[in-house]
Design a protein with these regions (language model features):
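A beta-strand signature from Gram-negative outer-membrane beta-barrel systems
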Residues: 1-34, 125-127, 140, 146
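Outer-membrane beta-barrel initiation region
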Residues: 120-122, 132-135
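A generic structural signal for short coil/turn motifs at secondary-structure boundaries
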Residues: 7-9, 118, 152-156
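N-terminal entry motif of extracellular EGF-like repeats
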Residues: 113-115
Length: 339
């Protein structure tokens, strides 16, 4: 809500808008237990058509480059060397996707499907929720909880998301004119995501810059290629670089209502406490690769571990009095004052 009524009830804080959260209250004296669960198989709704043929990709790249600059490039995106001899060899090759040139460096002539290397075809998710409620005329309670888990979309050793949340709500009538309500909730989330050798760059950007189909993921001797390290496939498949995100939220609200004069004068008060804790652990490792059988190299320059912690506490209270005098059937008046 963001209008005059929210400002009237919530004062200065109401000017920034008020979010009203309504949760279920147990009805009647029946004790109820309810379970709900599901299992899902998920896949991407939109999958781009990728050019995975190295020669076709190179032809299109050359056409674009020549139309822009009027001459042939000396490299493709500054890491992949280009010359006419390599281009003619790319046309000739089909079965053997790499060779060692006179300088002892690998040259690649691949048709790599980077989309399949980076993304899973489908992922699985499941959720389970439980609700217990009951009570009597003077006291009612509701306890609910939910667990949700989903695998990530990356073709990685560890890529997943887990969430736990719960709520306990109690309503009690201490006297006919005095009611108390407590609402406690929490949410705990954990996300484990793979990282490349440098977590400052998105996988999609690295893929666009270095993941062209002529590149290979591994060399003939099984070592990683420079492209596999740059794009992040090496990090995903070895699980040596990752980011672990944790977030916990807890909210406690206690409210009291006093009917000083039934249907005429009512006093309400509430107190809310909110606590949030966030943690992030990021680990980035050095990856070895080979530019040739006898040309080992690595990225990045060093291993790193970054840990961040955030804590937030928030408290708010409200007290307001509502006067609704009886003015007959044709007239009404409502006066509200609060702090």
């Amino acid at each position: 809500l963001k209008d005059a009524s929210s400002a009237a009830v919530y004062g200065a804080r109401g000017a920034f808008g008020v979010i009203l959260v309504t949760t279920k209250r147990a009805a009647g004296e029946r004790f109820t237990v309810r379970y709900d669960g599901s299992v899902s198989i998920l896949s991407r709704t939109v999958k781009p058509d990728m050019v995975n043929d190295g020669l076709q990709w190179t032809d299109q790249f050359l056409e674009s480059y020549r139309n822009c600059y009027g001459y042939d490039p000396t490299s493709i995106n500054n890491l992949f060397a280009f010359n006419n001899a390599w281009y003619e060899e790319l046309k000739r090759r089909d079965a053997d996707r790499s060779r060692v040139n006179e300088a002892g460096r690998y040259e690649y002539f691949g048709n790599t499907d980077w989309d399949a290397a980076i993304y899973k075809k489908s992922t699985a998710a499941h959720q389970h929720s439980l609700n217990i409620s009951g009570g009597s005329e003077r006291i009612k309670f509701s306890i609910s909880g939910r667990y949700f888990s989903q695998d990530g979309i990356y073709n990685a050793v560890n890529d997943w998301y887990n969430q736990y949340n719960g709520r306990v709500k109690v309503w009690g009538k201490i006297r006919d004119w005095w009611t108390v309500e407590s609402n406690t909730s929490f949410v705990n989330r954990t996300y484990r995501q793979p990282m490349s050798y440098s977590g400052k760059m998105l996988v999609q950007r690295q893929w666009e810059h270095q993941g062209y189909p002529m590149q290979l993921i591994t060399n003939p001797d099984g070592s990683w290629t420079d492209a596999a390290v740059c794009v992040g496939v090496a990090g995903m498949q070895t699980d040596r670089s990752y980011q672990h995100n944790k977030k916990f939220d807890m909210t406690q609200n206690i409210a009291m209502t006093f009917d000083l004069m039934k249907d005429v004068l009512q006093l309400k008060g509430d107190f809310t406490y909110y606590y949030n804790q966030s943690e992030r652990d990021r680990k980035e490792a050095i990856y070895d690769f080979k530019n040739g059988p006898e040309l080992p190299s690595s990225r990045a320059a060093f291993d790193s571990l970054e840990q961040k912690y955030f804590n937030n506490n928030y408290m708010a209270g409200n007290v307001y009095l509502t006067w609704t005098p009886r003015l007959g059937d044709d007239h009404s008046l409502k006066v509200m004052a609060g702090w």
